[in-house]
Amino acid sequence: MFTGIIEAVGNISAITSKGSDFEVSVNCDTLDLADVKIGDSIATNGICLTVVKLTANSYVADLSIETLSRTAFNYYKVGQAVNLEKAMLPTTRFGGHIVSGHVDAVAEVIECRTSGRAIDIWIRVPSQIEKYLSEKGSVTVDGVSLTVNAVTGNEFKLTIVPHTVVETTIADFKVGNKVNIEVDVLARYIERLLLVDKPEDKQSKISMDLLERNGFLL
């Protein structure tokens, strides 16, 4: 599990074919790998990847065809900058929100505009996940935990504060860029609770009113 608080920015140094799958090598000079071992997970632009090889300042992870087909990795080339976060520990400060590293969709940046020292960004997502986005809710974009400032149909707005601009790859976003999106897992759990009809419990205590009174709905 991750929090969406980026620890370092690395870059892809190689993408190597391994039969039907691939390996990706990531250079990460500014990420402390001293406590990382083979088999650990590192979120790489929001994608949970398992470390299979390790050096003092780089790691290698496997990439399946499934990962390539469902994430923006399909668009990456050698030199691509990537946001990095090691899996959280029980002692980690929980500064963002719950991030699984399982990408829900690939979206497109449709507008970038400077607003003082911040950057306003509009992103268009596939229509099937727009229902999970809500104003002032959380979303993960290329591994970064962010707050949704506005939603219009399948498009949403982010305002990126200067610190996040400096510490992540977001400063490099351009119109047309493809980005990894992970919606807030709580939205999916709420949907499941509302949709599941258990034969043994026809009198469910969960209602839209209950969810709203407890702060799950705005």
From Swiss-Prot:
CDD domains: Riboflavin_synthase_like
GO molecular function, one term: riboflavin synthase activity
Transmembrane spans: none
Residues the record lists as binding 2,4-dihydroxypteridine 1: G4, I5, I6, S145, L146, T147, T159, I160, V161, P162, H163, T164
The enzyme's E.C. designation: 2.5.1.9
Domain of life the protein comes from: Bacteria
GO biological process, one term: riboflavin biosynthetic process
Pfam families (UniProt xref): Lum_binding
PANTHER family in UniProt: RIBOFLAVIN SYNTHASE, RIBOFLAVIN SYNTHASE ALPHA CHAIN
Subunit structure: Homotrimer.
NCBIfam families cross-referenced by the UniProt entry: PRK09289.1, PRK13020.1, ribE
Name used for this protein in its record: Riboflavin synthase
Originating organism: Photobacterium phosphoreum
